[in-house]
């Protein structure tokens, strides 16, 4: 192999950063937070069939400019990673930006998550050209980051600590001018550099203010009509002389620490414009002080376009509003290679929130690249003894085994929903190690609470259930043990897939022991309840069939329904963990009338409470020309007198979203032929729903279903097959094409 081939091999494979040159900018008090680094690259010729590439691995965010032009449309690059262990490399084809002779390559950096890990804003960059020939690719190294580069501070700086509820914002000081100096090198021998799996964030929408009101304190309040995750871009009047503050609110009454603030410091002769660069906010409102006149727009950032993906509509405007709210919320929460709890206050990749809504998210969009990136962070967070944090990248947070078990559920669900087994093969040993850790924490088959550590706090099961639902005590151990049993079932399947038959037998036997222990420890025959008898407790036991016989199952179900109708008044009675479990039970047991009744409740606790307008009136007309107007909340209690206020764009309750597709539209995957290579279409009748129309993207194309006047029309994409109305007299299996059958 010649040196060019060797270089190509090195560029194509993950690099260990030992001996590599990360460069940044030193200032008097340490490292600049948002520096610029640059180098001039000479090209003897262009347009000879060669392509020119820049590969960038930054400890924090970066933007790439070549000859003054920004390269690409991706923002907040790279994705998140476990920065004490891994930096992500992004490759840019800069051929359209270069010219013969001198070319300036400039990287603008932002420390970002490096603030948490004690990493400076530093970057490793490689510039090379590549020519494809019949004999293979020829690669020529043109430049690599080192101390010959130049660096300068920039006008941007951070105002917060990058800790939960303390993220702050950005300060742009127009008085700061470039002061170029030799770049400082930073050794990161403990960091692995590997290619980014995630495709990158894009600006998916641009919004103008729907209103701009002058408040009594002379500040301006901008209302963009809906919550967005992203940036503010604003042009101030040239007469602006004061320091301008921009405070971001996800609802009108939000106050610190539930708000974040950017700062603009003008200078004579500056362009009087501000736009976020290495920070993002979640906001509907912006309160601006210090500016008399301005023009503003909100730039919505995400991994998915909220107008793309799966679609659903039915004859009930209330159900449509909830579906649209859940879908739009998830588009606000999915970015940078993970799905967060909330995009502004914590920004954590919680496994519990992920488990709660993965089936919904993967039903709505193709987010395989997000899960590949996110699972890499879970791998990096895993300790040799199998212990995991509750979020990845790792951060000390609250949660429990349901949060950690994302490492098992995400690969299995990605396989079922996309037919992609790569995560199973890549992380099988990690999943097995975590389950061994859980077994060591168990007594008589029941996992026991552990002490708080520097990695995680608390030992939770359900979280933020409505007032009056007892989610403590036995319920924590019961629901957690049910989840472990579910993970063991998934692991048994994955072990057989990967040829680990002996492991599969062990997982199956262990699951039987856990299920028997659940019934033995938590069933109360006198009340026909498990643990505390919550909706989560009862539904999980029924889903896993932990009871001894069908009579007991019928008694447990009857008690569950009595409590839902009586104690809970046909209202939702579950939290983060309970919502997806209850949803799955309703789908399996064809309880669409029950779910619809609960979803239609206009008062606390319920989803429609989240669709109230600024005057407190319900507004469930769904999306308009502006898109969905509402997002789901962190707590059912948001806005209630005397209750702690929380995030108004959150991932606690989005697990219900799959119900619209699997129950009302009836589109269900077949784990035996995953990725919707074969699927079922079995719409469930629901009182008050006269028609349903839905589409679902799959690796084979879109599935389309329409149900109207007792007639079911189904489009099956090429390469797929579907079983229509399984278990009924009209059951039939069909191939690609459009099919119509009568429901009755």
Model-identified regions with their sequence ranges:
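Alpha-helical support elements that line or immediately flank enzyme active sites
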Residues: 52-53, 230-248, 275-276, 286, ...
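Extracellular/oxidizing-compartment recognition motifs
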Residues: 20-339, 343, 369-372, 389-393, ...
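Bacterial Sec-dependent N-terminal signal peptides
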Residues: 1-20
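Helix-terminus loop motifs that line ligand-binding clefts
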Residues: 73-78, 82, 252-259, 368-466, ...
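Repeat-solenoid scaffold signature
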Residues: 109-128, 567-610
């Amino acid at each position: 192999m010649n040196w060019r081939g060797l270089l190509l091999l090195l560029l194509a494979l993950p690099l260990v950063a030992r001996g590599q040159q990360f460069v940044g900018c030193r200032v008097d008090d340490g490292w600049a937070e948002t520096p610029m680094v640059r180098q001039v690259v000479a090209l003897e010729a262009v347009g000879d069939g060669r392509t020119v590439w820049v590969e960038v691995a930054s400890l924090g965010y970066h933007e790439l400019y070549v000859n003054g032009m920004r390269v690409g449309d991706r923002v907040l690059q790279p994705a998140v990673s476990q920065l004490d262990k891994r930096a992500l490399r992004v490759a840019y084809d800069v051929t359209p930006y270069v010219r013969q002779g001198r070319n300036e390559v400039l990287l603008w950096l932002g420390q970002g998550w490096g603030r948490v890990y004690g990493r400076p804003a530093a970057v490793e960059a490689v510039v090379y050209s590549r020519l494809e020939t019949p004999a293979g690719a020829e690669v020529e190294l043109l430049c690599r980051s080192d101390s010959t580069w130049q660096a300068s501070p920039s006008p941007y700086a951070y105002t917060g600590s990058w800790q939960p509820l303390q993220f702050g914002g950005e300060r742009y000081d127009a008085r700061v001018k470039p002061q170029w100096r030799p770049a400082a090198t930073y050794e990161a021998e403990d960091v692995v550099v590997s290619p980014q799996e995630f495709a990158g964030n894009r600006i998916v929408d641009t919004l103008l203010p729907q209103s701009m009101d002058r408040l009594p304190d002379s500040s301006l309040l901008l209302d963009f009509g809906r919550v967005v995750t992203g940036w503010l871009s604003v042009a101030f009047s040239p007469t602006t002389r004061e320091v301008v503050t921009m405070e971001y609110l996800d609802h009108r009454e939000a106050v610190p620490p539930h708000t974040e603030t950017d700062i603009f410091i003008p200078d004579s002769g500056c362009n009087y414009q501000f736009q976020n660069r290495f920070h993002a906010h979640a906001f509907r409102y912006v309160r601006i002080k210090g500016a008399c006149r301005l023009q503003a727009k909100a730039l919505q950032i995400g991994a998915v376009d909220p107008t793309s993906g799966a679609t659903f509509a039915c004859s009930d405007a209330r159900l449509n509003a909830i579906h649209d709210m859940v879908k739009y919320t998830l588009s606000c929460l999915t970015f940078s290679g993970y799905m967060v709890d909330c995009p502004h206050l914590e920004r954590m990749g919680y496994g519990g929130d992920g488990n709660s809504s993965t089936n919904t998210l993967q039903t709505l969009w193709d987010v395989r690249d997000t899960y590949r990136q996110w699972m890499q962070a879970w791998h990096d967070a895993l300790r040799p003894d199998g212990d995991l944090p509750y979020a990845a990248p790792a951060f000390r947070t609250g949660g429990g085994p349901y949060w950690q078990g994302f490492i098992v559920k995400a690969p299995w669900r990605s396989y079922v929903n996309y037919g992609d087994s790569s995560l199973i093969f890549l992380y099988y040993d990690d999943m097995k190690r975590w389950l061994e850790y859980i077994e060591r924490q168990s007594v008589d088959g029941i996992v026991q609470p552990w002490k708080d550590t520097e990695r995680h706090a608390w030992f939770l099961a359900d979280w933020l259930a409505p007032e009056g639902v007892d989610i403590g005590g036995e319920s924590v151990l019961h629901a957690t043990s049910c989840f472990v049993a579910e993970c063991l079932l998934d692991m048994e399947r994955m072990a057989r897939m990967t040829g680990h038959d002996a492991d599969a037998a062990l997982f199956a036997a262990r699951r039987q022991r856990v299920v028997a222990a659940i019934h033995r420890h938590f069933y109360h025959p006198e009340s026909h309840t498990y643990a505390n008898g919550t909706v989560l407790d009862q539904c999980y036991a029924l889903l896993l069939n932990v009871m001894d016989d069908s009579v007991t199952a019928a008694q447990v179900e009857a008690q569950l329904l009595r409590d839902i109708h009586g104690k809970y008044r046909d209202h939702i009675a579950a939290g983060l963990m309970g919502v997806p479990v209850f949803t799955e039970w309703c789908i399996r047991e064809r309880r669409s009338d029950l779910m619809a009744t609960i979803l239609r409740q206009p008062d606390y606790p319920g989803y429609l409470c989240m669709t109230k307008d600024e005057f407190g009136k319900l507004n469930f007309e769904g999306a308009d020309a502006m898109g969905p107007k509402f997002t789901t909340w962190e707590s059912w209690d948001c806005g209630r007198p005397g209750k702690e206020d929380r995030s108004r764009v959150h991932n606690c309750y989005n697990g219900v979203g799959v119900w619209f597709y699997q129950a009302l539209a009836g589109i269900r995957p077949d784990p035996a032929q995953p990725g919707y290579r074969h699927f079922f279409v079995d719409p469930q009748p629901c009182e008050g729903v006269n028609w349903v129309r839905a589409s679902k993207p799959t690796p084979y194309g879109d599935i389309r279903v329409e149900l109207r006047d007792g007639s079911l029309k189904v489009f099956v994409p090429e390469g797929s097959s579907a079983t229509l109305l399984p278990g009924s007299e009209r059951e039939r299996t069909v191939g690609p094409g459009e099919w119509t059958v009568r429901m009755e």
